[in-house]
A protein has these predicted regions:
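Feature recognizes metal-dependent phosphohydrolase scaffolds
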Residues: 1-108
Length: 108
């Protein structure tokens, strides 16, 4: 699923979909690992969360979801993990862009 400008059609759409919904860990060359879906404490050696890469550490704040195992914790000020496992019975998290405040509501 490596990106290159010549990707077209379904191959291009598949790569984009994978980047937006499945990217969690990368190796030193930036290749995505699709196997690990758990907590960072259990990640395979040699892999790095995408939000800790040099490219992601720019001056922009990044809000993301679809990684409930993080339980909203990234350890990075610029990376805000919004998926706190509501569908698994934990909580739903919202982020206020104006104030930077996180609000959580326990799952019903």
């Amino acid at each position: 699923a490596a990106w290159h400008d010549a990707l077209q059609g379904m191959s291009r759409l598949r790569a984009i979909t994978n980047y937006l919904t499945r990217m969690r860990l990368l190796d030193a060359q930036g290749v995505m690992d699709f196997a690990h879906k758990g907590a960072l404490s259990n990640k395979p050696e040699g892999l790095l969360p995408w939000f800790k890469t040099d490219v992601a550490r720019q001056s922009q704040r990044i809000l993301f979801g679809h990684w409930a195992a993080l339980e909203g914790q990234t350890g990075q000020d610029h990376a805000i993990a919004l998926d706190t496992g509501c569908v698994w019975g934990r909580s739903l998290t919202a982020y206020c862009l104006e104030t930077g405040e996180l609000t959580q509501q326990q799952a019903l």
